[in-house]
A protein has these predicted regions:
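Conserved acidic donor-binding segment of nucleotide-sugar-dependent glycosyltransferases
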Residues: 91-98, 107-112
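Nucleotide-activated donor-binding/catalytic signature segment of Leloir-type glycosyltransferases, i.e.
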Residues: 12-37
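Structural motif corresponding to alpha-helix initiation and N-cap regions
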Residues: 12, 30-34, 61, 98, ...
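Nucleotide-sugar-dependent
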Residues: 34-39, 46-68, 76-84
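A charged, aromatic-enriched C-terminal amphipathic alpha-helix characteristic of glycosyltransferases
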Residues: 38, 113-144
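Glycosyltransferase donor-sugar binding loop
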Residues: 1-14
């Protein structure tokens, strides 16, 4: 079963046209942020599709860090610095290639141990590099450096 969170209303009309898929697709246009971990933890795979637009260039979606923290396999696109943030612990696809998305999902289900390890390593990477405590410490160090070089 597919669960789409944050899907545009137009997605529902596509699902409605595919009668055979209606029972297999659940759409939540928007959910409260506090409910997000519950939904993400129920997933087998987290997909974060980013299109290559002027809006997404240079942007790292916050949901990437949410996904990494859940220790689940992540499928996303190699736009901006997403590939660097994941550090090899995700599956990268061409944003304009739905067949590649389908094949990657099939691959993950055919290789569950690899997918599990990528998810766990993504979580570890997120904790070591992107946790708020780590970032706060690094920011304070940089501020101290600036303060001492300017005095």
């Amino acid at each position: 079963r597919w669960v789409l969170i944050g899907a545009a209303p137009s997605v529902q009309s596509h699902v409605d046209r595919m009668k055979s898929n209606q029972d297999r697709v659940v759409i939540f246009p928007k959910i409260p942020f506090k409910d997000l971990p519950q939904h993400l933890s129920a997933a087998d795979i987290l997909v974060i599709p980013q299109r290559d637009t002027t809006d997404t260039q240079g942007q790292i979606p916050a949901k990437l860090f949410d996904a990494m923290s859940m220790a689940k396999p992540i499928i996303t696109t190699p736009l901006s610095d997403i590939e660097e943030v994941l550090g090899g612990y995700g599956y990268l696809i061409d944003p304009s290639n739905p067949d590649q998305l389908a094949k990657t999902i099939e691959y993950i289900f055919a290789n569950p141990e690899e997918a599990r390890l990528k998810g766990l390593n993504a979580r570890k990477r997120c904790q070591e590099l992107y946790d708020i405590k780590v970032l706060k410490k690094e920011l304070n160090l940089q501020i101290e450096k600036l303060a001492t070089t300017n005095s």
